[in-house]
Every structure is written in C-alpha cells, then in structure tokens.
Amino acid sequence: MTKLIFMGTPDFSATVLKGLLTDDRYEILAVVTQPDRAVGRKKVIQETPVKQAAKEAGLSIYQPEKLSGSPEMEDLMKLGADGIVTAAFGQFLPSKLLDSMDFAVNVHASLLPRHRGGAPIHYALIQGDEEAGVTIMEMVKEMDAGDMISRRSIPITDEDNVGTLFEKLALVGRDLLLDTLPAYIAGDIKPEPQDTSQVTFSPNIKPEEEKLDWNKTNRQLFNQIRGMNPWPVAHTFLKGDRFKIYEALPVEGQGNPGEILSIGKKELIVATAEGALSLKQVQPAGKPKMDIASFLNGVGRTLTVGERFGD
C-alpha cells in the first residue's frame, strides 16, 4: 500500500481526495489544507472543502499559514509517506519537503503547458479556448513547470462557466489520477517535459480585470462574464453604481458600446464594439442576484433605450 500525504483546498481538491479514499491501494497519512477563513459580509469562519472531507474520513489535518519552515512541515516529513499528491493547494511546496519524498505529483486543471498558475479554468473561458483539461505532473520548485505524466481533455461548450467547468474537471482529475498513479509509481510511465515555447500563464484574477469594457466584442465579453461566474463576477456601472453581470448571451445588434438597444419584459440588449449582449442574470448594487425579468420589473423599470452602461 502506498502511503500518501494529500494537499488541497477547494471543492476540486475534495473530489480528488475522495477518489483516493475509495482506492485501497493508498493510505492517506495526513491532509494539508489552507487555514479556516472568514468569508462573506458576516465574516463567518469557514472550513475548506478539503478539511470537511478529511474530517468525515477521520484523517489527520494540518493547516499551516505557510508550509515552508513550519513545525507542520517537520511533522509531515516524519510520517514516513511515500509521496505527495496535491490539487489546488494554494501554496508553494518547499524543496526540502519535495526532496524527502519518493514522488510528488500535482493535479492541475489545464492542458499544460497552457495556463500555468492559479486560475486556469477562468482563463480557459476568458480566452475562448475550445477545450479544457487536466494534467497530472511532477512537482518541482517552479510553479506548474514539472514534467507531464498524463493529460486528458474535454470540450468547452457555450453553456459552460467557471462553476460547471470546475465540477467537470474535478471528476476528470479524480479519474485521471486514479488511472495514472499506479503505472507512474511502478515506473511504467516516462513523464514528458513541457514545451516551454508554448507556456502561458493564468494568475489569479485581479479586481481591475473584473470590470467589463464595452469596447470589446460581444464574444469577448460573453467569455469574460462566464469566465468569472460564479466568482469573482464581472461588473460594469449603471448610473454610477456597480452592476454585476453573471450571465449574458451574444446576439446581433449595433450601437455605441454600452448603449441599451432594446428593452422587453424579459430582455435587455446592450451594444458592444461588435454585436450586442442580451443580459440574463444580474445583480444591481445593494440587491441580490436576479434574472433579467425580475430586474426589469423592479429597480430596472425606469431604464430607457439609449441609456448606457459603463463609467
């Protein structure tokens, strides 16, 4: 039985962990995840999905603010683990820890070498990729730069957003890891170096990148909106107030970028640099998320054709 330390944080990681727990070829000696954080307006302390899954399984849990140089890292190195599996952990692993293991692999939610970094699923959508995927890779000191053990792709559809793609790729990652790990441990797979000429990066989304620029095409804005749904959520401004857009569809239309072209009972069409967007799910300032019909029947009922979104 191979003894593992698992490291991860969000739902994506929890799905991978649960997969490992169903396989009797592995024993999880410890789980490492990010510390509990205060979330939401009420600052409620929330455990990570990986911590919740580990508690349910009765596993030992470590939550260092920073793994490097921590007492927790020293404890982990004394457990006698054969290897480490990480999936969206959110911290760099010190070389000292990596070197103490027979192997260390990462489940990364992109088709490397494309989209190295912390937001690969967001960028796959924002940049209009036709496919997404998961790469199982060896861990090295440089971020997401290790040799590739295996890859598996799925198509991206127009119905996908960050939430749906996270769910799909979590299952892909779980299955790919379970399919790949035994042969890798046995030495039957020769990892493939990444083509450095094809590397792209997907750093965490910055707040200024959430703002919509109506001078882009309808397709570019469509991709940006779904590439930030359900988090961090794209926004614009309406009458000086922040206005979040969760869902929109590209449609035909022509006008000044940001201009309202038409208003119906269940339809609000806004011009872009090329074509237009039909807004479907929005959140006005100080209000909950709502469908466009609810918005137009409520706070949006005073809108008129010709008014503009934007600064």
Swiss-Prot record:
Task performed by this protein: Attaches a formyl group to the free amino group of methionyl-tRNA(fMet). The formyl group appears to play a dual role in the initiator identity of N-formylmethionyl-tRNA by promoting its recognition by IF2 and preventing the misappropriation of this tRNA by the elongation apparatus.
Keywords for this protein: Protein biosynthesis, Transferase
GO CC entries: cytosol
Domain of life: Bacteria
EC numbers, comma separated: 2.1.2.9
Signal peptide coordinates: none
Pfam families recorded: Formyl_trans_C, Formyl_trans_N
Family of this protein: Belongs to the Fmt family.
MF terms in GO: methionyl-tRNA formyltransferase activity
Keyword Transcription: no
Reaction equations catalysed: L-methionyl-tRNA(fMet) + (6R)-10-formyltetrahydrofolate = N-formyl-L-methionyl-tRNA(fMet) + (6S)-5,6,7,8-tetrahydrofolate + H(+)
Alphabetized HAMAP family for the sequence: Formyl_trans
Residues annotated for (6S)-5,6,7,8-tetrahydrofolate binding in this entry: 110-113
Name this protein carries in UniProt: Methionyl-tRNA formyltransferase
